[in-house]
Amino acid sequence: MKRVHVAAAVIRGSDGRVLIARRPEDKHQGGLWEFPGGKVEDDEPVRAALARELEEELGIRVERARPLIQVRHDYADKHVLLDVWEVDGFSGEAHGVEGQPLAWVEPRELADYEFPAANAPIVQAARLPAHYLITPDGLEPGELISGVRKAVEAGIRLIQLRAPNMFSPEYRDLAIDIQGLCAGKAQLMLKGPLEWLGDFPAAGWHLTSAQLRKYASAGRPFPEGRLLAASCHDAEELALAASMGVEFVTLSPVQPTESHPGEPALGWDKAAELIAGFNQPVYLLGGVGPQQAEQAWEHGAQGVAGIRAFWPGGL
């Protein structure tokens, strides 16, 4: 089967909006929207191909870019690798050099545009931040509320309310308060009974690996349009998550952790290998913090997740 390597860009303006282009009607999947880019030539570095394509298509010069996600997609006649980079620094004013219509879109509104099927993971990656905060165990509700408030004020945009030692009624009350803090500012992910779905319409759900295995055979236990995530530790769990149609996962442990001493860590190379076989955004977890975000990007991850390293004031 023919193999095609494509470099594509999630171009982010200073206001946070993302640039998309509409495909010509006479091309394959014409009329659909896409992320700008083009084919990587033989022996051409991906970043160089990206810079060349964006200058040819949009008249801009790339000044700052980093890996975002790789998506593999099989068509009837070819296998395509979409090598997607986030570009948040460029010079020049973007315009359709070839006459193609362009649009600057708020990330949350990307889902309202029609893209080729292979672009769905890119849309999701463009909407997700690089950091994922998981709340720590053993804190009182007031301490958790205060910490989440500080985290949101500091710019954290994705938060998992994890409180395994709380009884359900206490967790539910806390989730109501935390949802209010996050409204319009951060995406809240809950870890509670799925029967609560209707009571938290703005929240996503993060499945434990045990829940993932429990629900996998029945399919996605969650409405489309709301974020579903899962905790994964190996290739089998990643395959289950993919079959369920999750929007993102955490993959752990990357490195040894204080919370699980003695548990074997994946290591960076194994994590990269697992990510390469998974087409959705992945947050690396376990022994990592904000300072490892760049290393995570280089290994194919969306970013990093953590508890201690992200909690305001530390633990």
Predicted regions and their residues:
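Conserved N-terminal beta-strand and adjoining loop/helix that marks the start
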Residues: 1-18, 70
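Conserved Nudix-box catalytic region and its N-terminal flanking loop in Nudix hydrolases
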Residues: 17-57, 68-70, 187
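Active-site mouth loops of central-metabolism enzymes
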Residues: 128-143, 227-232
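Alpha-helix-loop-beta-strand connector modules within alpha/beta enzyme cores
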Residues: 172-192, 217-234, 263-289
